[in-house]
Regions:
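Conserved small/polar residues in nucleotide/adenosyl-binding loops
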Residues: 121-127
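Residues that form generic nucleotide/phosphate-binding pockets
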Residues: 13-17, 62, 66, 123
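Short, extreme N-terminal leader segments that mark the start of a protein/domain
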Residues: 1-32
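Sensory/regulatory domains in signal-transduction proteins
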Residues: 62-120
Length: 128
């Protein structure tokens, strides 16, 4: 079973576990055009992206500045907050998957829309 097949299975399971507010996306960095790197996505409505779209600006900057000469960069980043152009608050994690030779191949991202959770928390505080 290939690496991408395994990543797709994991992505699907995570999306099923956490529901429609959880986007899970896989980028293939070996494509000719990194701005069209999405090869798999679950719940793309969270960021309004689909197959063939590109990474977020933050991930794109990391990819563009990586020279693939060190195993230490870029580093995975878990639990950071992002705000979408339409105002959603996302809690995100990004993992950089390397080939056996150490070169970047995939980016595995989890983007969880916590806007509703924050709104419900705020509402319950107001009602207290």
């Amino acid at each position: 079973m290939g690496r991408l097949t395994v990543l797709k299975q994991i992505a699907h399971d995570i999306a099923c576990q956490f529901g429609p507010d959880c986007e899970v996306v896989i980028h293939d960095l070996k494509t000719k055009d990194p701005e069209n790197s999405i090869v798999y996505i679950e719940n793309g409505h969270v960021t309004n992206r689909g197959i063939g779209d590109g990474p977020s600006n933050a991930v794109f900057d990391v990819i563009r500045h990586n020279n693939n000469k060190t195993q230490d960069e870029p580093r995975d980043h878990a639990g950071y907050l992002m705000k979408t152009s339409d105002g959603k608050i996302l809690k995100c994690s990004t993992s950089y998957i390397r080939d056996d030779d150490g070169s970047l191949h995939y980016v595995f991202g989890i983007n969880y829309d916590i806007s509703r959770l924050r709104s419900e928390e705020h509402t319950s505080e107001l009602q207290s």
